[in-house]
Amino acid sequence: MSNTKQADGEIHEDQLLNFLVNKLDEEVDLGLGANAEIDAEDIYEVLVGACADGTSISKLCETSEDSPHENTVLYHLREKFDLASVERVGNALLQKDVLEVLPEQVEVVADLHLRPYYGDEDETDGLYHSEAKRGTTAFHTYATLYARVKNKRHTLAVRRLADGDTASSVLAEFLGLLDGLDTGVKAVYLDREFYDSKCLTLLQAHNYAYVMPIVRWGKTIKQELSEGWSRIIQHKLTGKLDGPAVTVEFPVYIDCTYQNGRYDEHGVARHGYAADAPFIQTPRDARYHYAKRFGIEASYRLSEQSVVTTTTQNPVVRLLYVVVSLLLQNVWRYLHWEYVATPRRGGRISRAAWS
């Protein structure tokens, strides 16, 4: 008789949380010592549970009878982790099971997420500064790289940004990661934060198909986007790349539509996309394919809901919360694929990973 465990058709929350707690406990040694009043698993249970509930460490410890004291957990989160290790180990864990799930070729998306900082202006060291948004110029900023499979995001990497970091430096790291994957990349979709000469030069140098919305910089492109109908133009951006100024030329697809009162707007809406991909032949193709990336916005909203509620400005702890939130999503999709999804020809061997 076979001893293979059969999935019961769904993944239960306790199985998901136990799987991630076990994974963290196996991969990250906190070095608490034999005489510590709690062990690493206790800390990870609180951390993962708070992320899953979208609540604070303090609230979870207060309402759970068997949880350690909040101060004990928060102390170890502050003292036992550093930025480099959280980023390195976090990205390794994000990729560990995801790469098994991905098809032979995927579309990937790179995004910058700017979370506003409203604290003391004299305590913004280590934050990322950008143009004013939502009443501030200082942000807790994270770049994410993820594969999109059937409108679901599978996060491959997360990177925290501080002053001195640039979109191009982050993109260079992400493209280097993609170069090392066995999975093929059909195209890279980027948000407008990556629209500059350095990022476009990198994409061309790595020979990746790409699509991103343009920013209305300069009289030429503003004029192009204020008149005419759908068309393809050649455009140039100039910027410094490791010293001398470099000019990059690329096609811009301008797609035009009548607004017909949508959002109480009328007239012609013109959308410009920097794009170079074999499957994009017309401006409507560019808009259609870029719009598909918004199919994952529900996943991003989920990540915002499944992150620990906190007021801490500690960059290490905040990054840790983001990483665990992304791990929760990856693990759920991996477990669903491994244990619940319709078996393929030949089947899969399901092991009790959460037991």
Q: What is the predicted function of each stretch?
A:
Residues 1-38, 53, 227-255, 305, ...:
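A short, flexible helix-boundary coil/loop motif
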Residues 31-34, 281-290, 302-322, 339-343:
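Short, solvent-exposed helix-loop connector elements
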Residues 46, 60, 73, 104-115, ...:
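Short, conserved catalytic/metal-binding motifs centered on acidic residues
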Residues 128-182, 271:
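Electropositive, glycine- and tryptophan-enriched low-complexity nucleic-acid-binding patches
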